[in-house]
Amino acid sequence: MERTCTRRWRMKLEIPDVKKLVHEMVMPIRWGDMDAMGHLNNASYMRFMETIRIEWFSAIGCEPNPQGQGPVIVNVFCNFYKQLQYPCNVLMKMYVSDAGRSSFESWATFEPVDQPGVIHAAGGATTIWVDFPAQKSAPLPDWMRALIS
């Protein structure tokens, strides 16, 4: 028996209006970042978001410490609005919001440098603060909470 899908499934997570801009950087699309259709590959969007997140963590002194505490990403998503194609320099903007006991949300937008304000994609991630030796969540440190709030 052949099965057909009669529903249109659509998962789209919204980027909140209330968020705090914490970091910006320009990333060039490299030839190897493209898919067979000449667009920025879906996996590359995740890599771009990872890159700006890690650059921000480094800028605020949040370096990896397996014997202590630090951030762990527990989910990530990206909404695609317009195609990004090579060659292109992409202005990445990173935002944070929603500080909880041990977590916060981060958001990233993608806009071509030559098209200011035209967002081609936007995504986000949930970050949990973890006590690595105990392998469980820990309260956000006050210094991190102050940066997010």
Residue ranges of predicted features:
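Catalytic strand-loop segment that frames the active site of acyl-thioester-processing enzymes
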Residues: 5-58
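Residue-level recognition of specific faces of alpha-helices
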Residues: 45-48, 72, 126
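HotDog/MaoC-like acyl-thioester-processing domains
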Residues: 5, 9-25, 80, 84-86, ...
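A short, contiguous structural element within a folded domain that forms the immediate neighborhood
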Residues: 61-67, 71
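Short, well-ordered turn and helix-capping elements at secondary-structure junctions
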Residues: 31-33, 61, 77-82, 114
